[in-house]
Amino acid sequence: MPFAVERDLARRALDTARTRGATYADARFVRRQVEDAVVKNGHVDTIDRSDTFGFGVRVVADGAWGFAASQVVTADEADRVAALAVEIAKASAVCKTAEVRLAPVAPATGAFRSPVVQDPFALALEDRVGLLVAADAAMRSVKGPRTTRANYEIWREEKLFLSSEGADCEQTIVETGCGISAEAVGDGELQIRSYPAAGGRTQNQAGWEFVEKWDLVGNAPRIAEEAVALLTAKPCPQDVRTTVVLGDAQLMLQVHESCGHPIELDRALGWEAAYAGTSFLTPERLGTFRYGSDTVSIRIDSTTPGGLGTFGWDDEGVPASEGWAVKDGVFVGYLMSRETAAALGKPSNGTMRADGWARLPLIRMTNVSLMPGDAGSLADLIADTDDGIYMETNRSWSIDDKRLNFQFGTQLGREIRKGTLGDLVRNPTYTGITPEFWGSCDAVCSASEWRMWGTPNCGKGQPGQIGHTGHGAAPARFRNVRVGVVR
């Protein structure tokens, strides 16, 4: 969208904030359009559309933060909101424990647009929903599933950011997601299979071409058949230790929960504890702590094509960047804001994002990815494994408030016997302590198996915000892992 009027209003808000006593101010105008559709058991269950537009002003005054927002986009409202933000900052300063300090950054200027081949909003609604109807019908062609679902989400966000330091940039982010799931019930068991990922959806920064590449209709019968077959599959062994090979879609969530959240510097500093606590990766461990084996390298990269954490600039006007969280097993990097980076005497790597115009930006995962190794294909990795369990597609998880002790359950498991995949395993689970678990990783598949996954539902903050994060991974092997529920 053209931002000519909004740019003038942003400048006005910044001027008002400075006049009222702000030493720093920024203004964000955000328009977000979202459409979700679900087909369930042969019927169109929901088609939801939303369109929101508004602006927020963030300031520092008397050494403290203030923020205010509105969906009334007028000159008078720009003045009112800016003045209110300064008033809130000055009130907050009464009980501040330290002055806000910001790491320096060059003023952001320019424009960024998600690369899109086929605009999902330009496709006829009948065609979008028609694909879901066909995929759902293909699952229902299999005898046995109790419930079938197919869904998509299309998402567009247009943002304008100006700051009192001279930043002036705009961005258009387009995302598309899709998936299918089947549930089967029998003998007190509920089994679920979803594709391509847990929750029946994965999402990337892309157009409708992203949906088409997953071939939902072609994969639908297999997913339904697996859900039914799991009802009579072997149960997961109870409380034993064995080798575990995790599929890349499961590793995506493992990275998210046991690396992505603990490297958020606000958690590590103890400034943030909402939605699952602080972090065991405290600053004195930076650069020396053994997070995993030499095989494990995890990258922070907001430039990765297709990633939900890809952008031109974060919501503080810091440019996209790339670096390491873990390099050859050693913890070396955080996700940082300008304020938290200043606390460590470092430049920000640009990870502050807000959930729309009405919320303050928070440190959020960008694209935090397990980098590929040299173990070849998944078939090669299985062939190199004498005994163990292959697990894929998350079903449940639990992790403590330091991000150390965890348990994950997956939808599907398969025995590994003498280098081949064997019988199905139902209700597979594994548990561990984060550095011990990553320390047991002795193989990661090669780049040909690496894939970028998306998590469009990451919660953080109070009031709560939903973030969109990207996680690349290839299948990997872990030795001496505790599997099965402890009885």
Which residue ranges define each predicted feature?
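N-terminal small-residue-enriched
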Residues: M1-R487
